[in-house]
Amino acid sequence: MCSMDINRIRHILLDQGFRGCIQISNNKQPVFAQAYGYSDFPNQIPNTLETKFATASAGKVFVAVSILQLVENGKLRLQDTLGNILPLDWHKIDANITVEQLLMHTSGIPDYFDESVMSEYEDLWKDFPNYRIRTNADLCPLFLYKPMMYPHGTKFQYNNTGFVVLAMMIEAVTNQPFDICLQSNIFSPCGMNSTGYYEMDSLPAKCANSYIFEKARDRFRTNIYSVDAKGTGAGGAFTTVGDIEKFWNALLSYKLIPRKATSEMLRCHSGNKEAGYYGYGIWLEPTDSGYSPYFQGRDPGVSFISFYEPSENATITLVSNYGDNVWKLLRSIRECISGK
């Protein structure tokens, strides 16, 4: 990537008023990393490359890796069922849903936040206070008594409940909170020292506040009453752009799971042209030579995407604590990198 490319990328970010952090790496080496905007808007404290950002659904990829690690260690099988691993009263939910179906969003399990019906995550908390959500099990009342969305294994539909249940499986098999398991088996081995799941009312140092703009009142407010009090298997990890690069490097060099398991994770298992294509816990963009993997997340005041471009051996990570359109920025940056 030449200096002209980097200058053009800077102009793209400034022209679109980006607020957050970006890191672009080529051959595992950062070639551009920059922070914009404020982590604390009223006090004008700027974002930095050390700022920890909320990432919404991006955390599903960590849960998927953890599940595949347990499979490799013989503690789980992809064909294990919901009822087998979590022997609860599942009411109208089919206990024969498999681990694999949960991983690739074909389970049909009722979604506590069905993105095909609901547009705003904060609407969930009108009748159920968000401050109660501090574990995966805390979300059970929001889906446990609902009927199946469709027979398991018959279609692809992105589903948040599925990854909450996968995290509950991790907890059942390891006998520890899922975030502690992820810390021990993913974050620490990768050197991701600024990544974790934190309670919104006791955030550690260097965490960015996430802001929602209220047009009617012409002001920003934080999202503390709009998201879970602590992240779950569905998402909610805090991280830095540098830590995400460490994750990609470890994943793609088979330090987290073996080559065969990594290939299966990054292989297309479900999805379609309209909804998108999916591996295990990761999105896939079709290319002439295969697929480019990426993971992403959106919550009120939060937007995140991290994309791997195999043809360039490059990663691009964008995260905003103002919900900026990181997808539009990514398209512009990819065009810049490809020389279009």
Which residue ranges define each predicted feature?
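Short, conserved catalytic-motif segment at the N-terminal edge
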Residues: C2-T55
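Short, well-ordered beta-strand elements
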Residues: V31, F304-Y322
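A short acidic/small-residue loop/turn micro-motif
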Residues: Y38-F41, D228, G323-D324
